[in-house]
């Protein structure tokens, strides 16, 4: 869906669903706005809302209302305009643990109404306490909480990666992923980390973020100009991450119609002398050059030219 700049009120709500092989129902929710336009609301709206709320607290922003403030419109539409932002962030963060976050959102609201427990939304403490302990029934016939879901997903993630990067392939990347998994288990598990970040003010917020970066780092950070740096802890080698980025560039090149190398902006900034006309016409042939760029080196090493 397109972004919608203005705050158009919600007039009504429509939903439909289909059933997948496991028997689970996948819902699609449509907001009918007062100008009679329709907007498909989904998990993206929840993710963008959380990012928007944290960002606007510390920096100037200019975001379209939908999807960045869709959640505010939903709370207003349901008659909960009094609910504090920190509660809203906590609420949607919880819903994102479910594979059907929008459906979970409406189900919990209905649950609170039926059980006369709407007061749960009055404060962050009451909301977070209720949700952290609230189980939901997974389609596999077992109860799930955000703790069990996180632990299960981390285990599945680790297993998947061990199959993808078996043996000695990308050992630094494997070691870093294990660091992130261990950090998530000890520091992020069973808490609403984004809601907690949102509640932090000024220096405390930046201290927390810097703490995360010092503990686990960020493999590669790229800006719109193609500049790239690494914020990894000192005992990790960023070169493996660059190699993986180059593999991704190759996948983008062979799967699309664009003749440009996906790394050309990066090379133009970091090492402009290594670029030439082949980068925008036939980057595979870069493997024949005397001075090799990252893409050409990958092609040559694997004999793909």
Could you tell me what each predicted segment is?
Residues 1-63:
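Metalloprotease/metallohydrolase-associated module, dominated by Zn2+-dependent proteases
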Residues 6, 66-305:
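Non-catalytic terminal regions of proteins
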